[in-house]
């Protein structure tokens, strides 16, 4: 019963705060806030510069591989098994998936900058 009360109070408080933030916004529009900030100076060009699509693809690939490595590192503690063969098999499967993903990116020329 105590947990139900705490849950209902949390939900009611969250709903109340969201409603207040939705219905009472700040309506003061300042021109300084609408402009991009560039070290205190007026911006020389547009704040939305074009970027290389190759860089974007390499950055996304890096983030995906980095996430997979972050999931691989705590694997021995997450499995909580004393059987070293099971742990090594699971780690080998994850490393194999990483290697296959890297090989696929390499074959699709996703890591090439010169093209």
Curated annotation (Swiss-Prot):
Query: Single Gene Ontology BP term?
Result: mitochondrial electron transport, NADH to ubiquinone
Question: How the protein sits in the membrane?
Answer: Multi-pass membrane protein
Reaction(s) the record says it catalyses: a ubiquinone + NADH + 5 H(+)(in) = a ubiquinol + NAD(+) + 4 H(+)(out)
Span-the-membrane segments of this chain are 4-24, 55-75, 87-107
Positions the record marks as coiled coil are: none
**What Gene Ontology terms describe where this protein resides (cellular component)?**
mitochondrial inner membrane; NADH dehydrogenase complex
Subcellular locations according to the entry: Mitochondrion inner membrane
Q: Does the keyword Membrane apply?
A: yes
Keywords (A to Z) from UniProt: Electron transport, Membrane, Mitochondrion, Mitochondrion inner membrane, NAD, Respiratory chain, Translocase, Transmembrane, Transmembrane helix, Transport, Ubiquinone
Q: Which domain of life is it from?
A: Eukaryota
What's the short name of a Pfam family annotated to this entry? Oxidored_q4
Q: What molecular functions are annotated in GO for this chain?
A: NADH dehydrogenase (ubiquinone) activity
According to its UniProt record, the EC number is 7.1.1.2
Q: Which family does it belong to?
A: Belongs to the complex I subunit 3 family.
Q: What quaternary structure, including any partners, is listed in this protein's UniProt entry?
A: Core subunit of respiratory chain NADH dehydrogenase (Complex I) which is composed of 45 different subunits. Interacts with TMEM186. Interacts with TMEM242.
Role noted for this protein? Core subunit of the mitochondrial membrane respiratory chain NADH dehydrogenase (Complex I) which catalyzes electron transfer from NADH through the respiratory chain, using ubiquinone as an electron acceptor. Essential for the catalytic activity of complex I.
Q: What is this protein called?
A: NADH-ubiquinone oxidoreductase chain 3
Organism lineage reads as: Eukaryota, Metazoa, Chordata, Craniata, Vertebrata
Instruction: Name the gene.
Output: MT-ND3
